[in-house]
């Protein structure tokens, strides 16, 4: 059987597609997967790195653009539609899965005209315009969060959760808090004394802003470094900055005398999650799926300009269950960020309990459910 997975742009769209591809290929060695994306998206480097074939098409957004921008976007989409039709004729897939992002629209429209079974996966609490449009004719609509069900036709909608890549699933057998939490709990002398006053244990912090980094988080961490340096907590920090901020952030850590690994991009997120006691990050749906599966306590700083503020709503779904911490970007400051990090570093039991509550909300079989549904029409 052959499957096309279309979309991307960001890791939040792409990584669930990679998870589905891994599951699909595991069912039958003869199965084939082809990814379709754009040259500007993360898929241009991440899909080949993951070992999957990729075809690039023209696609662009039109929402929020002026008249000329909308015309250009529409022209690119039409060209992408023609390219998609040619790909369908050449590859002859049995099904097409759209995972969101610009490339999914022309490919699924082409699949519709070629009468190829089509499916979409929505990662967020509030779906984007592309998936809202495609849902009108998709054979099946897979959703990550119950909150998004109101946007789609109920009889074709299935709550699956967000598919997890193999590198994350392989860590499930060792899921727990990072080594810093375990060491702090061992060193605590009584139930009331804050661990931050106990010398020795290191609290491991993972900071990232999605696959492309987040400038606001990067700059807030830079501003918070003097406050973190003065505190009596040993911090081990891994900070993924994105390409544009890497040198500036790395220089700030060196200047402040704070130990850190500063990276533009992290390919092996599973290993970094395993080392972390606390994760400071955006609230994209894929990030949430990964950290809940690995029982990680998170301080979410939702991207305030996400379409329909969906990142805040993603985080609030966990916050209502005391399964995370959240700081809105409009409230973000060096003082507040440092205070929250130090508060949590000093309370390992709270961090552990939050991670346990996060795990209780994880859905670990999303990729299996989606592949089962994709295979069903051909059985």
From Swiss-Prot:
Region (Disordered), start-end ranges: 174-195
Any GO BP: regulation of cell shape
InterPro entries, A to Z: GlcNAc_MurG, Glyco_trans_28_C, GlycoTrans_28_N
CDD domains referenced in this protein's UniProt entry, alphabetically: GT28_MurG
Reaction it catalyzes: di-trans,octa-cis-undecaprenyl diphospho-N-acetyl-alpha-D-muramoyl-L-alanyl-D-glutamyl-meso-2,6-diaminopimeloyl-D-alanyl-D-alanine + UDP-N-acetyl-alpha-D-glucosamine = di-trans,octa-cis-undecaprenyl diphospho-[N-acetyl-alpha-D-glucosaminyl-(1->4)]-N-acetyl-alpha-D-muramoyl-L-alanyl-D-glutamyl-meso-2,6-diaminopimeloyl-D-alanyl-D-alanine + UDP + H(+)
Record-level Gene Ontology MF annotations: UDP-N-acetyl-D-glucosamine:N-acetylmuramoyl-L-alanyl-D-glutamyl-meso-2,6-diaminopimelyl-D-alanyl-D-alanine-diphosphoundecaprenol 4-beta-N-acetylglucosaminlytransferase activity; undecaprenyldiphospho-muramoylpentapeptide beta-N-acetylglucosaminyltransferase activity
Localization annotation: Cell inner membrane
HAMAP family referenced in this protein's UniProt entry, alphabetically: MurG
Function per UniProt: Cell wall formation. Catalyzes the transfer of a GlcNAc subunit on undecaprenyl-pyrophosphoryl-MurNAc-pentapeptide (lipid intermediate I) to form undecaprenyl-pyrophosphoryl-MurNAc-(pentapeptide)GlcNAc (lipid intermediate II).
Protein name: UDP-N-acetylglucosamine--N-acetylmuramyl-(pentapeptide) pyrophosphoryl-undecaprenol N-acetylglucosamine transferase
Protein source organism: Pelobacter propionicus (strain DSM 2379 / NBRC 103807 / OttBd1)
């Amino acid at each position: 059987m052959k499957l096309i997975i279309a979309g991307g742009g960001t890791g939040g769209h792409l990584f669930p597609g990679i998870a589905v591809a891994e599951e699909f290929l595991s069912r039958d060695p003869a199965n084939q997967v082809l990814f379709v994306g754009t040259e500007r998206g993360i898929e241009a480097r991440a899909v080949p790195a993951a070992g999957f074939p990729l075809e690039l098409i023209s696609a662009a957004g039109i929402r929020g653009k002026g008249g000329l921008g909308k015309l250009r976007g529409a022209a690119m989409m039409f060209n992408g539609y023609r390219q998609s039709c040619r790909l369908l004729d050449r590859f002859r897939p049995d099904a097409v899965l759209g995972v969101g992002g610009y490339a999914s629209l022309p490919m699924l429209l082409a699949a519709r005209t070629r009468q190829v079974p089509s499916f979409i996966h929505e990662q967020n609490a509030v779906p984007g315009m592309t998936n809202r449009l495609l849902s009108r004719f998709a054979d099946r609509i897979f959703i990550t969060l119950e909150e998004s069900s109101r946007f789609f036709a109920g009889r074709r909608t299935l709550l699956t959760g967000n598919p997890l890549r193999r590198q994350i699933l392989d860590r499930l057998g060792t899921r727990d808090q990072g080594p810093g939490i375990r060491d702090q709990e061992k060193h605590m002398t009584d139930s009331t004394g804050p661990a931050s006053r106990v010398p020795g244990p290191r609290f491991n912090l993972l900071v990232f802003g999605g696959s492309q980094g987040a400038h606001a988080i990067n700059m807030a961490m830079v501003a918070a470094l003097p406050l973190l340096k003065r505190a009596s907590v040993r911090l081990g920090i891994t900070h993924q900055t994105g390409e544009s901020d890497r040198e500036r952030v790395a220089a700030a850590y060196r200047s402040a005398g704070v130990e850190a690994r500063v990276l533009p991009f992290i390919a092996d997120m599973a290993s970094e999650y395993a080392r972390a006691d606390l994760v400071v990050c955006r609230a994209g749906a894929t990030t949430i799926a990964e950290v809940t599966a690995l029982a990680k306590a998170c301080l979410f700083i939702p991207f305030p300009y996400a379409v329909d503020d969906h990142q805040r709503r993603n985080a609030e779904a966990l916050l209502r269950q005391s399964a995370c911490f959240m700081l809105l970007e409009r409230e973000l400051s060096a003082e507040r960020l440092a205070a929250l990090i130090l508060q949590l570093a000093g309370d390992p039991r709270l961090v552990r309990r939050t991670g346990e509550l996060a795990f209780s909300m994880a859905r670990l079989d999303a990729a299996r459910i989606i592949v089962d549904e994709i295979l069903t029409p051909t059985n």
